[in-house]
Amino acid sequence: MRFSPQLEQGRLLVRYKRFLADIETDSGELLTIHCPNTGSMLNCMMPGGRVWFSRSNDPKRKLPGTWEISETPQGRLACINTGRANTLVEEALRAGVISELTGFTALKREVAYGQEKSRVDFRLEYPDGYLYLEVKSVTLGFDGSSVAAFPDAVTQRGARHLRELATLAREGVRAVLLYCVNLTGIDAVRPAQEIDPAYAAALREAIDAGVQILAYGAQLTSEEIFIDRRLQVHGLD
């Protein structure tokens, strides 16, 4: 996926109220833009750090742009716009990049399912039945490590999705959780036990129930982003 329009660059001043960020563009313009990420963004919001944003020409929008990419203190690029992950995964699915999930005959997004009234990111149809696929965007990395972690903040919603997938798996329905790692320089991903032990426990229970766990990494520049490789998943035993 190519970023269109082309991203503009600036420096982060501050992120606040979770969904807002003040930046200074390279031309010296001061802007308040939308932050499309509900997490803590622990390694992605250093004041003075480089950021890239998309600018909107829609006069009905309250904010002129959307924060898309951060440069982390480790010099990595992270796509912090969590809404991009599902688009990337759909592109990869249709291109056959995710080898474990090829052969489907139909794809639907945001399908209602489950006892807790969730909406799954993708429902893939195969000749022998449905596959339910939940996607999580990963951007949390650490100094000196090529292993990313999820989540970067406590996520009750993430644990609920795992419970829903586990219920399907126990009923004999194929259920998959895919970590879409939108952070450069990463070889593997793990559950962030130290941040959300309840999520890590729910992940282990989902695996025991038969949920399949996958991780794929994205190639990322300020011009384009696309999924290009499978990653290892650590900490599942």
From Swiss-Prot:
Signal sequence residues: none
Listed Gene3D superfamilies: 2.40.50.580, 3.40.1350.60
Pfam assignment, any one: SfsA_N
GO MF annotation list: DNA binding
InterPro entries (alphabetical): SfsA, SfsA_C, SfsA_N
UniProt family annotation: Belongs to the SfsA family.
NCBIfam families, sorted: sfsA
Protein name per its UniProtKB record: Sugar fermentation stimulation protein homolog
Protein's organism: Pseudomonas syringae pv. syringae (strain B728a)
Gene: sfsA
